[in-house]
């Protein structure tokens, strides 16, 4: 493994390179992928709007994340890039908008992974936090015998109610819809 990172208040960049042989095993850690060589690069820039003009907006952070992997077990190459922007607000408010494009190997085939995603959360009150996420686009149906390209639409939302240090209740909702891309058939 090799890693490099550099950051200031305005900029951050990082890169990473690693290789795990097919026979690699580590019993004391969770490792879900071996037999690959992986490299990624990340870059961000931070903008701090004028608090007098935009008192509710704390920071704007465009960023990119790019990853390339040669996978010996799945017999192919994976590549994806994420182009995104994060918005940081008062009350621990946060919104992330991104577009993921790329492809991945599975069972000797190549599948597209193009998706739009939105993530958000906020601490509305000391005792109430909320979140909502959505994702839509191409996805893979991971059947080891007969995988295929699909389209997935995912939404999730929820809240945590914590009126005291002794009581915390979270309620979450998640819906995932997956359709076969070739026919539109719901899976």
Model-derived features: positions:
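Exposed, low-structure sequence patches enriched in small/polar residues
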Residues: 1-187
């Amino acid at each position: 493994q090799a890693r490099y990172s550099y950051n200031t208040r305005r900029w951050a960049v990082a890169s990473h390179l690693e290789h795990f042989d097919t026979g690699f095993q580590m019993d004391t850690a969770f490792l879900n992928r071996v037999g690959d060589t992986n490299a990624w690069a990340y870059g961000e820039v931070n903008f701090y709007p004028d608090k007098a003009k935009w008192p509710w907006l704390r920071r704007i952070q465009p960023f990119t994340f790019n990853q390339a992997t040669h996978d010996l077990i799945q017999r192919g190459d994976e590549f994806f890039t994420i182009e995104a922007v994060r918005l940081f607000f008062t009350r621990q408010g946060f919104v992330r908008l991104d577009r993921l494009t790329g492809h991945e190997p599975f069972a000797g085939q190549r599948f597209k992974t193009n998706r739009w995603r939105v993530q958000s959360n906020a601490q509305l009150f000391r005792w109430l936090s909320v979140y909502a996420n959505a994702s839509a686009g191409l996805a893979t149906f991971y059947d080891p015998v007969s995988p295929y390209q699909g389209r997935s639409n995912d939404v999730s939302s929820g809240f945590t109610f914590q009126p005291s240090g002794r009581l915390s209740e979270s309620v979450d909702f998640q819906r995932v819809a997956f359709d076969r891309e070739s026919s539109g058939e719901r899976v």
